Amino acid sequence: MAKRINRAIELLEQNQTIYYDGGHTGHVLTYEQGLKDAHIWADYINVGMEHGSFDMAGLDQYIRGLIDGGPTKSGHRTPAVIVETPVEGSSEEIIRFNAWQFRMVLARGVHGILLCQAETPDAVRAFIESCRYPINMTGVGHGLERGTRGTGSQPTSAPVWGVDADTYVDKAEPCLTLVVF
């Protein structure tokens, strides 16, 4: 039985190396591909939207295929899905102007976002704040301000994780994978 919803976090907590599959120029985002990828060898699936299509309808279908094709061999409902967004992380302003993309991606129920070209501490801080709920006060006043992610996406994201809306809000905040390169 899986200890975490996100296998990548589960392995990192055990000081294990994690491996991914998926290109940086797009991914086949169909229900059928989700069925195929449900038993992928990798610890997480990278969905490259930085250089690929920003396709939320396709991402919805793909994740539905992962759910219907699951669970994984490790007992997780789906493989972890981490999306590279097409937002350049070079400044706080760019992040804040494009935060809607993070909200859209997270509303699909993905397990994390990879911010490409994170070039300044202010950009990284703005990214984290954009992905966090305002109700979570951890770190606020110690380098972070309140989160700006709205709490209206649980009807779509919680079922992906196999939990109710309140549980999603509790679990999404501390285990959301924010990968910054």
Where are the regions a protein language model picked out?
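Expand to "…catalyze enediolate/carbanion chemistry for C-C bond making/breaking, isomerization
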Residues: 1-181
